[in-house]
């Protein structure tokens, strides 16, 4: 088994949130075995900017579920959705 790369869209709960701080909190929340390869930002609307981390996880049962759950628990996160998944 190899690894899987997933681009995950993380919507903050406010356009006023400090995205750098949110990015740090997302990195700290990662479950064991997962790592972030990079972040992109996507202007959504009305000043709201989504974070799009590319997360690397082992290819196994559950896939990105543990990462999604961890991100949902981070203060300031409104929603989490997997945008794209592929094997490395």
Swiss-Prot record:
One of its GO terms (molecular function) is translation elongation factor activity. Pfam families: EF1_GNE. Belongs to the EF-1-beta/EF-1-delta family. Promotes the exchange of GDP for GTP in EF-1-alpha/GDP, thus allowing the regeneration of EF-1-alpha/GTP that could then be used to form the ternary complex EF-1-alpha/GTP/AAtRNA. This is Elongation factor 1-beta. Gene3D superfamilies: 3.30.70.60. Keywords: Elongation factor, Protein biosynthesis. The lineage of its organism: Archaea, Methanobacteriati, Methanobacteriota, Stenosarchaea group, Halobacteria.
């Amino acid at each position: 088994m190899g690894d899987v790369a997933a681009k995950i869209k993380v919507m903050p709960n406010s356009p006023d949130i400090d995205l750098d701080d949110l990015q740090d909190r997302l990195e700290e929340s990662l479950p064991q075995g997962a790592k972030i390869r990079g972040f992109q930002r996507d202007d959504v609307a009305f000043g709201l900017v989504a974070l799009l981390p590319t997360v690397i996880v082992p290819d196994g049962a559950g896939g990105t579920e543990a990462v999604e759950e961890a991100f949902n628990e981070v203060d300031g996160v409104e929603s989490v959705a997997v945008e794209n998944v592929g094997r490395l």
